[in-house]
Amino acid sequence: MLFDYRKGGLFLGTISEKIFSRAAGTEAKANDFVLADVDYAMAHDGTSVLAVNAFKEMEMEKVWDPSRIVVPFDHIAPANNETSATLQREIREWVKEQGIPNFYEVGEGICHQVLPENGFALPGKLVVGADSHSCTYGAFGAFATGVGATDMAEIFATGKLWFKVPESFRMTVEGSLRKGVYAKDLTLYLIGKTGIAGATYKAVEFYGQAIRELTVAGRMTLCNMAIEMGAKTGIVPPDEKTFEFLKNRAAATYEPVYADPDAVYLEEFTYDADDIEPQVACPHQVDNVKPVGEVEGTHVDQVFIGTCTNGRLEDLEVAAAVLKGKQVAVRTIVIPASRTTLLAAIENGTMETLLKAGVTLATPGCGPCLGAHQGVLGEGEVCVSTANRNFKGRMGKGGFIYLASPATAAASALTGEITDPRTV
């Protein structure tokens, strides 16, 4: 329980308020500014370069705690040119100089998969990453958010950062998702309802039967895209599924945090899972969401299954179930979110099914999601992607990106056009 440090009384708050109260060592309510202790800090190959440069400009010699800094190489991994290779070499040297043990080389996977797999995403913790989708870790009951390189340099140096405690939304999804409807569909549906700026700088807490029934992987998909509605973070209260996932992998002890019954929310929303069918986010905004039936038949040049949103084992299994015994009609790129995911998919036969269906397998990492390599689009080409963003130019300046679930992506790969997965 957290107490009101000014009055000595019981402090009733949201999950975010409680986590910041613990991290700041004082009562922290929505809209307060606090200097908080960061539990874990992450910067990948794309952002660590800027953060390290800023750290050096501060004339700092040693990071505050090497054991609480995580550096995965995932965005341009393997390096796509000499410039990237040189920058990555410099970061490797810095990591070695600083004695940072939590360094994950090319091929180990995407930061937002690697951190949970290695037990850094923990209930009640304040986890900060130099990447906007760091909100993924809220799936484990952490307050997790992204910051810029200068802020990350400050964390590297001191382990602390100023925050404005966000106001909170409470989103409840009652009922169960129907067959053929997945966490990605639920996520896109909520973004469509909220809008890309509808939750700006809010912490969104997710509740309801549909949320409780999501797997850990499904919750990661949901919280990963909280930023796409403008949120500072998305949080699922931890439960037995969370604790089971963390068993034998948690990097530290942790104390789960839950909102109190009298916690104050800026707004509360309730949705019915039965209203949700397969969803597609159409170009060029993530909130341009439509039921798959409204865009069914749209020509597709490429399908991409992977990313920090939907590159986990269960995502690959869903795609494999759709493709089993069949052949893709268009080029289809599959990139597991991590080496661990890839090995598991090999061991249970999922990867064999996908490869026999004609997909192209690439190194675990971000792949073409950010438009750097491994499947960027040509002028006028259309891609159905399981990623989290479809902005103009995201995967190539002339491309068109439709965001969908692994099931919808796989079904579209079979037909060469956007297809309802329930029909194949």
Curated annotation (Swiss-Prot):
Pathway: Organic acid metabolism; 2-oxosuberate biosynthesis. Signal peptide: none annotated. The keyword 4Fe-4S applies. GO terms for biological process: L-leucine biosynthetic process. One of its GO terms (molecular function) is 3-isopropylmalate dehydratase activity. Coiled coil: none annotated. It catalyses: (2R)-homocitrate = (2R,3S)-homoisocitrate; (2R)-homocitrate = cis-homoaconitate + H2O; (2R,3S)-homoisocitrate = cis-homoaconitate + H2O; cis-(homo)2aconitate + H2O = (2R,3S)-iso(homo)2citrate. It comes from the Archaea. Keywords: 4Fe-4S, Iron, Iron-sulfur, Lyase, Metal-binding. Heterotetramer of 2 HacA and 2 HacB proteins. Belongs to the aconitase/IPM isomerase family. LeuC type 2 subfamily. Component of a hydro-lyase with broad substrate specificity for cis-unsaturated tricarboxylic acids. Catalyzes both the reversible dehydration of (R)-homocitrate ((R)-2-hydroxybutane-1,2,4-tricarboxylate) to produce cis-homoaconitate ((Z)-but-1-ene-1,2,4-tricarboxylate), and its hydration to homoisocitrate ((1R,2S)-1-hydroxybutane-1,2,4-tricarboxylate). Is also able to hydrate the analogous longer chain substrates cis-homo(2)-aconitate, cis-homo(3)-aconitate. These reactions are part of the biosynthesis pathway of coenzyme B. NCBIfam families: hacA_fam, IPMI_arch, PRK00402.1. This is Probable methanogen homoaconitase large subunit. It comes from Methanosarcina acetivorans (strain ATCC 35395 / DSM 2834 / JCM 12185 / C2A).
